[in-house]
Amino acid sequence: MFPQSAKERLAQSDLCAMDSLSQIVLGAAVGETVLGRRIGNRAMIWGAVAGTIPDMDVLGRYFLSELDNLAFHRGISHSLFFSVVGAFVFGWAADLLYRSRHHALIAMVTKAAAAVVVGFVVNFLTMILVPGKWLPIAVYISLVGLWWWRHGQRRYFGGTWEAPDAGRREWAALFFWGFLTHILLDCFTTYGTQIFAPFSNMRIAWGTISVADPMYTVPFLVCLLVAARFARTDRRRALWNWAGIGLSSAYLLLTVVHFNRVSHTFKEALITQDIAYERFFITPTIFNNILWNGVVDAGDAYLLAQHSFYDEVPVTFTPVPKGLDLLRNVDTDPTLATLRWFSDGFLNAVRRNDGQLQVNDMRFGTFSGEATGPDDYIFRFNLTDNGPDAPYGFQQAQGGPPDDTAETMMRSLVKRAQGIKASATE
């Protein structure tokens, strides 16, 4: 196994549910829309909780095998079925909690849970922006403690706290829309979302937006924070909240336009270069919607390519062998069947320097945009050969490209997104 680092978290943020920040913001805005006028900022807090609950399926790693957990993530908890049933269950639970005579204590626990969620967001941003630094999270913990010392004790134990004016139906509506919008946003990413579970394991992956895109999240977050400063009956509160929803939704629609533009560019390049192919898959690179990765299924091999909207040169394709001849029982092995399903068939195999087999989900591409070696693949898995009659053992590989740093990766990403100029190829 390889040491986990900031660059792995950067590359595999989808698997680790690092998109929670966007889902928290979206959930909070939805909660405000449903109940904000009646219960104020508590609607945002509970909306953020609703936006986080589906991703709690990551806890499956503690009681499932790695292979089963891979299939479980974005499964039943991300389904339309869960949105309906879960809304009634959590709505009933929230109503029951606030009807309890211990509602003040419950409110305190809820606030603590919200602080933990926000702390997770701070920790996420710290890992991305200043990996290895502990000061931001320490400052956050200090501010939470200061707030509790000055306001929390008096409010929750001084008799000034009141239960929110919401019934079971209103709570169920908040959770339903929080769950549903979470699922829909995930459908726009690459990983795949089983929205029809448990009736079907079909995965929806439109691949129009990166799992972490600040252009979607940051304006949304700013509008939400401004809205939270106004009283619940102030019209400006709703205005700012809807501004955030409108901006984020408009950007999401723009990513669909970008997707169609890049898809057309790839088709034209394949036709112009007289390349026969069966299908291709495109997806934006991390943190932006300008630089896109593409993988083409050309039959016996894959073709990798990157395209930036600022490129002045044609798309260049790099062939990568499928390597399926390295595997045995390709059509019957249950481990390989799960990986083919997970990757939508965009799977290749390589042999590592230590002799171990490695299979890669080609939809996520490589760090370099080509395929310089086994460690260059972003989404990769190690296989253990247990004998000719036994299924392959499975273990998700960890680590990033050797001798690299998150800062170097980001610089390379920014430079490539700026495009390849025609003069550079002359």
Language-model segments: residues:
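N-terminal membrane-targeting hydrophobic helices
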Residues: 2-264, 268-284
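Extracytosolic and intramembrane catalytic regions of membrane-associated proteins
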Residues: 276-279, 286-426
